[in-house]
Amino acid sequence: MMDLVAYTPRRPKSGETLRGDSFSIALGGKGFNQAIAAGRAGAQSSMLGNLGTDGFGDDFMKAFVAEGVNSSDIERSAELGTGVGHISVQTTDGDNSIIIIPQSNDLGDAQYISRHSKTIIESDILLLQLELPTSGNLAAAKLAKENAVTVVLTPAPVAALVGWEGLVDVVVPNEGEAAELTGIEGDVTKQAEALTKLLGCKNV
């Protein structure tokens, strides 16, 4: 996901045009950030996913090379552009809201995972998030579990976690995601207990 970030004192009301403070474009997306962070921490990191054949896609490929992240499994589409995230950040308190437009990310389905299964099977840890199609995520998680690969799930953007039970070793939601997934507000201990039951995992 290419992050398009608008910084503003507050969010606009419906129908309102609001003057912002600044704007930035940055390489982002949870998968990209995790792959880069893992590489910088010393892991042999590989990225699976889809990009457009546009300028944003070129920027990502250059970044993978610069960071030493294996990008040989990335497929590129001429029909669908690179996914983007429209982010609004309140400069008063840092609170943010995000709209994602997946575009080529939606090509990361079960068939894509099948074509790139070798990378998952040969890994120690598989990091997943919900910016990709459910079919692709579940196929990847099942393949990982069948081959004793640890599965770490970031459940964002929040979606119903149907079919995930027994496939996740570690789930890492933020407070808002935990509340939305469990229906429990404010009590992180109860949220963690609910998520372990929901997913059948031991680590939150």
Where are these regions (language model features)?
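Conserved phosphate-binding/catalytic loop of the ribokinase/pfkB sugar-kinase fold
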Residues: 72, 76-77, 87-125
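Glycine-rich phosphate/adenosyl-contacting loop at the front of the ribokinase-like
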Residues: 1-50, 55-69
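Conserved phosphate/ATP/ADP-binding segment of small-molecule kinases
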Residues: 138-204
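Beta-strand->loop->alpha-helix junctions that form or flank phosphate-binding loops
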Residues: 22, 48-53, 71-82, 154-156, ...
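Short beta-strand scaffold segments in enzyme catalytic cores
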Residues: 36, 84-88, 97, 204
